[in-house]
Amino acid sequence: MASEGDKLMGGRFVGSTDPIMQMLSTSISTEQRLSEVDIQASIAYAKALEKAGILTKTELEKILSGLEKISEELSKGVIVVTQSDEDIQTANERRLKELIGDIAGKLHTGRSRNEQVVTDLKLFMKNSLSIISTHLLQLIKTLVERAAIEIDVILPGYTHLQKAQPIRWSQFLLSHAVALTRDSERLGEVKKRINVLPLGSGALAGNPLDIDREMLRSELEFASISLNSMDAISERDFVVEFLSVATLLLIHLSKMAEDLIIYSTSEFGFLTLSDAFSTGSSLMPQKKNPDSLELIRSKAGRVFGRLASILMVLKGLPSTYNKDLQEDKEAVIDVVDTLTAVLQVATGVISTLQISKENMEKALTPEMLATDLALYLVRKGMPFRQAHTASGKAVHLAETKGIAINNLTLEDLKSISPLFSSDVSQVFNFVNSVEQYTALGGTAKSSVTTQIEQLRELMKKQKEQA
């Protein structure tokens, strides 16, 4: 254990920290992922100190050499974390002192861990969100391109898990793609809030050494500089926003996963998952379980839990930095890892599943065309509410007779309304049914094709911003 004098806050305290307190306080196991970005921030700050006249050129070169050595050790995985390292910032400073001696202590001149930890977190999130955005756009592309290939496949659409109207399989795929484009847009908005530099804010009052914050911004490639030092070191709006966007994204993926789980059951038989994304049973040899989709579905709860915990941490804090904020890094890193894995698995599932066009078509039933029967009467001049009632009577008559609605005779239909004529037979055609929904957003082939074209264009724009 390091002596009290070696600790960052050494000098004020007598005796050693209680071991249980040390264990509770440490966050090093979580924060090792921030090691490299902490080095980046320290390199930028060292250059700013030299410009401000705090470091000589020789001292700067020595510090930069030490930081680069630590970066090299990190890349090789040989950096050693000690029991006394409370967090990654402490570990890097301790290692720098081991490499270059007491001159390492100059690096922290005018800099507080309060600003250091939030700068590191923002740098980590900037990098991570770019990767997440790339994976998300790949998933959207996979959905869109599959929709283009399988555009002629028709299956039942459901409301309340009851057969409702026939739709194109592509319409189903695109419904999820469109939702995910909104998530992609929201990730872009979060990036804007992350891209504000807090470094140079000190503990809360600012930096007293005439540090060039514009130089820091440029070195670390932030878009702008924080306006108020007290706000900069304590605000975690960007964390809440990211976790909120991640939660909504996982809810969308959970819905898609649930749909696909249902469609993959033997009761539906609409699709089969690849063996690469399925597992078996330890007891029942015949089982092929959609574990990939079930895990995607479960992760929504995990991510929402992270959001809820951070909101509860923040709701009771006074201004500026408090140790409670240590919880933010574990939440962010866990959600970054979860999203990165889930998006890749979802893309793998969508790209490899096999659909059964035959089973989808078998599931189409004439009763699903009852709305079309009402629309037939509307086109004959009947008000929709009356047409709806007439179609309902036709459904009831067919049920009474124990036959499908398309097997009602013309006389049966005329007994309901004289507007029925021989051309009513054209209503009972599933291709004709989907093709009438030509308005933008509908399930007609022309509309689905337009959706695909617009989504491809939107993806190009979002890729440029990723």
Swiss-Prot record:
One example GO MF annotation: catalytic activity
Key words, A-Z: Eye lens protein
Disulfide bonds: none
GO CC annotation terms, alphabetical: cytosol
One GO process term, biological-process aspect: arginine biosynthetic process via ornithine
Highest taxon above the source species: Eukaryota
Tissues expressing the protein: Eye lens.
Keyword match Transcription: no
InterPro entries recorded: Arg_succ_lyase_C (IPR029419), Argininosuccinate_lyase (IPR009049), Fumarase/histidase_N (IPR024083), Fumarate_lyase_CS (IPR020557), Fumarate_lyase_fam (IPR000362), Fumarate_lyase_N (IPR022761), L-Aspartase-like (IPR008948)
Function summary: Delta crystallin, the principal crystallin in embryonic lens, is found only in birds and reptiles. Despite possessing the necessary catalytic residues, this protein does not function as an enzymatically active argininosuccinate lyase.
Assembly notes: Homotetramer.
Similarity field: Belongs to the lyase 1 family. Argininosuccinate lyase subfamily.
Protein name (Swiss-Prot/TrEMBL): Delta-1 crystallin
Phylogenetic classification of the source organism: Eukaryota, Metazoa, Chordata, Craniata, Vertebrata
